[in-house]
Curated annotation (Swiss-Prot):
GO biological process: translation
GO cellular component, one term: cytoplasm
Annotated protein name in UniProt: Small ribosomal subunit protein uS14
Subunit record text: Part of the 30S ribosomal subunit. Contacts proteins S3 and S10.
Species: Chlamydia muridarum (strain MoPn / Nigg)
Length: 101
């Protein structure tokens, strides 16, 4: 089980990313655009640098919905490999059966 503070921090980051996604995208577009002046691009880069670090989507880390475990995350099921194995063996995940050949 992950620390509650780590899970809460991740939730906070997700909210920040969602709230600032549009503004960040516009600034990135301006910073990369060759059609605007160099001065304008520089201002856009500075504005991006002044934004909070946690507004960047690259700071997000997927976590298990049940335990908060950050590693061994299965995207399709949004849980960790350990929880997946337990739930699959108990038959709690529809359509998942143990392979045999």
């Amino acid at each position: 089980m992950a620390k509650k503070s780590a899970v809460a921090r991740e939730v906070k980051r997700r909210k920040l990313v969602e709230a600032n996604f549009q503004k960040r995208a516009e600034l990135r577009k301006l910073a990369k655009s060759l059609s605007v002046s160099e001065e304008e691009r520089e201002r856009a880069r500075e504005a991006l640098n002044k934004m909070k670090r946690d507004t960047s989507p690259s700071r997000l880390h997927n976590r298990c919905l049940l335990t908060g475990r950050p590693r061994g995350y299965l995207r399709k099921f949004a849980i960790s490999r350990i929880c997946f194995r337990q739930m699959a063996s108990m038959g709690d995940i529809p359509g998942v059966i143990k392979a045999s050949w």
